[in-house]
């Protein structure tokens, strides 16, 4: 293995830069040339490829986003686009490709591996929705971003005796809502994995009001409901003033936490090691604080891993 390349694809996540840094510096330490591909698979199709050095990744471990930038590509989803991508990699002499991203990015890596490209995937997505790994890069930072916001919302909700409904990211996975809700002492956590009863929630809010409760904090994953709709219903049924807050893309930004920087560094290092071991079509993950790897087809076939025990703990501590 003499030359490898790295790209970031799909939605950005804090810690991607730390992973890029680890891939580049591990590769250079092993005497490998490392190329950077800008703007994901779209940039690959346009030949946006350059050689990276140690200076290329200096002072980026603390930065959010991705220095390689990211984009989505409709052309790459076609057989012709994937064949074009493999030809471009061959022209540049790339013998191994590291793909940092989420489920869609891994699907792209899988397609390239089936065309003979040696690929390794690193999970970078704030949603934590890849079931084969305990945590994905960016998740911890996103949870802490949400926690900071709900701490502030709790202050103003208490002052006014209101309820706050906070909508966070998570179309199919409620982990951000669950972890931030538990850490922030939310009274209710609404996730796509579990059925939600608005009438029961309103009844609980009324009981709390009768017992002197000064505020209510409800966290909802975007795939489970809309904060504005839930807030309107709560206010109409209970008479309690209720405000909705949609945190949106702020959850993707910001300097990564120590946990995300360390996780990304470990995963990036292992990805290069796997290529040097002549392994391909693998994804890196973490289980029980051990860096592991798995066949990409198997990893993508594993179903969701929602932690119902953690949810029950949050529920027990909520009122």
UniProtKB/Swiss-Prot annotation:
EC code(s) of this entry:
2.7.1.11
| Catalytic activities | beta-D-fructose 6-phosphate + ATP = beta-D-fructose 1,6-bisphosphate + ADP + H(+)
Detail which positions bind ADP.
Answer: 21-25, 154, 185-187, 213-215
Q: PROSITE patterns this protein is in?
A: PHOSPHOFRUCTOKINASE (PS00433)
Q: Where does Mg(2+) bind?
A: 103
Which SUPFAM superfamilies has this protein been placed in? Answer: Phosphofructokinase (SSF53784)
| Subcellular localization | Cytoplasm
Key words of the record: Allosteric enzyme, ATP-binding, Cytoplasm, Glycolysis, Kinase, Magnesium, Metal-binding, Nucleotide-binding, Transferase
* Chain positions recorded as ATP binding sites: 11, 72-73, 102-105
Tell me which domain of life the UniProt entry assigns to the organism this sequence originates from.
Answer: Bacteria
Name what cofactor the protein needs.
Answer: Mg(2+)
Pathway entry: Carbohydrate degradation; glycolysis; D-glyceraldehyde 3-phosphate and glycerone phosphate from D-glucose: step 3/4
Q: Name one GO biological process term.
A: fructose 1,6-bisphosphate metabolic process
Q: How is its activity regulated?
A: Allosterically activated by ADP and other diphosphonucleosides, and allosterically inhibited by phosphoenolpyruvate.
Subunit structure comment from the entry: Homotetramer.
Q: What does this protein do?
A: Catalyzes the phosphorylation of D-fructose 6-phosphate to fructose 1,6-bisphosphate by ATP, the first committing step of glycolysis.
Query: What is the recorded name of this protein?
Result: ATP-dependent 6-phosphofructokinase
Species: Clostridium tetani (strain Massachusetts / E88)
